[in-house]
From Swiss-Prot:
<dbReference type="InterPro" id="IPR001867">
    <property type="entry name" value="OmpR/PhoB-type_DNA-bd"/>
</dbReference>
<dbReference type="InterPro" id="IPR039420">
    <property type="entry name" value="WalR-like"/>
</dbReference>
<dbReference type="GO" id="GO:0001216">
    <property type="term" value="F:DNA-binding transcription activator activity"/>
</dbReference>
<feature type="DNA-binding region" description="OmpR/PhoB-type">
    <location>
        <begin position="124"/>
        <end position="223"/>
    </location>
</feature>
<keyword id="KW-0805">Transcription regulation</keyword>
<feature type="modified residue" description="4-aspartylphosphate">
    <location>
        <position position="51"/>
    </location>
</feature>
<comment type="function">
    <text>Forms part of a two-component regulatory system CtrA/CckA that controls multiple events in the cell cycle, including cell division, stalk synthesis and cell cycle-specific transcription. Binds to a group of cell cycle-regulated promoters critical for DNA replication, DNA methylation, and class II flagellar biogenesis.</text>
</comment>
<dbReference type="Pfam" id="PF00486">
    <property type="entry name" value="Trans_reg_C"/>
</dbReference>
<dbReference type="GO" id="GO:0043565">
    <property type="term" value="F:sequence-specific DNA binding"/>
</dbReference>
<dbReference type="GO" id="GO:0001217">
    <property type="term" value="F:DNA-binding transcription repressor activity"/>
</dbReference>
<dbReference type="GO" id="GO:0032993">
    <property type="term" value="C:protein-DNA complex"/>
</dbReference>
<dbReference type="InterPro" id="IPR011006">
    <property type="entry name" value="CheY-like_superfamily"/>
</dbReference>
<dbReference type="GO" id="GO:0000156">
    <property type="term" value="F:phosphorelay response regulator activity"/>
</dbReference>
<dbReference type="GO" id="GO:0005829">
    <property type="term" value="C:cytosol"/>
</dbReference>
<keyword id="KW-0597">Phosphoprotein</keyword>
<dbReference type="Pfam" id="PF00072">
    <property type="entry name" value="Response_reg"/>
</dbReference>
<dbReference type="InterPro" id="IPR001789">
    <property type="entry name" value="Sig_transdc_resp-reg_receiver"/>
</dbReference>
Length: 231
């Protein structure tokens, strides 16, 4: 999961970054609202964490600017203010959630997962695709009731495929999701990850493959039950 953190207090930013990275998130930080707006427009994040008190512009202005620009990335506000008026303004401006500092790590992680799930159209923390069950909170995968042990990169790919089930994802999208533009390997590494992921899933799925290759475009995760119904 890719998170943009817009926070001007370096100590707070470092603490949040460590919290999220310990959960396997890819975190990108900036202490300026204007830069946060630019990054939010250019890159595809799963979530934006936004502080309200920034040195160059208010967090509410950052929020409104992103929404006016039709950026639909979920935005969670981080603020030391518990004032109702402030909360009302942020929700009216397009915020998806609001957390008051200081906050507990477990609550923050749970809220992040909930907001991202809703943004992808999933109200529950478990996504089922045929025999495959992905638990987004526990970061576990089961096939036919059997636990499948995946590497971090393999899990991130399956999570992305599950969240965007039925949508063809390009190799560039996978690469951006896994590495976020930092020390990215060649595109062919995605084929290697997909091959390994397919083998692990098929071993518990009686040889069935749920990840399809869309030649010249990328890969897609399809629910076999939906295909049967469509037929």
């Amino acid at each position: 999961m890719r998170v943009l953190l817009i926070e001007d207090d370096s100590a707070t930013a470092q603490t949040i970054e460590l919290m999220l990275k310990s959960e396997g998130f890819n975190v990108y930080t900036t202490d300026l609202g204007e830069e946060g707006v630019d990054l939010g427009k250019i890159y595809d994040y799963d979530l934006i964490l936004l502080d309200l008190n920034l040195p160059d512009m208010s967090g509410i202005d950052v929020l409104r600017t992103l929404r006016v620009a039709k950026i639909n990335t979920p935005i969670m506000i981080l603020s030391g203010s518990s004032e109702i008026d402030t909360k009302v303004k942020t929700f009216a401006g397009g915020a998806d959630d609001y957390m008051t500092k200081p906050f507990h790590k477990d609550e923050m992680i749970a809220r992040i997962h909930a907001v991202v799930r809703r943004s992808k159209g999933h109200a529950q923390s478990v996504i089922k695709t045929g025999d495959i069950v992905v638990n987004l909170d526990a970061k576990t995968v089961e096939v036919n009731g059997n636990r499948v042990h995946l590497t971090g990169k393999e899990y991130q790919m399956l999570e992305l495929l599950s969240l965007r089930k039925g949508t063809t994802l390009t190799k560039e999208m996978f690469l951006n999701h896994l590495y976020g533009g930092m020390d990215e390997p060649e595109l062919k590494i995605i084929d290697v990850f997909i091959c390994k992921l397919r083998k692990k899933l098929a071993a518990s799925a009686h040889g069935k493959h749920h990840i399809e290759t869309v030649w010249g475009r990328g890969y897609v995760l399809r629910d076999p039950n939906e295909q049967v119904n469509a037929a």
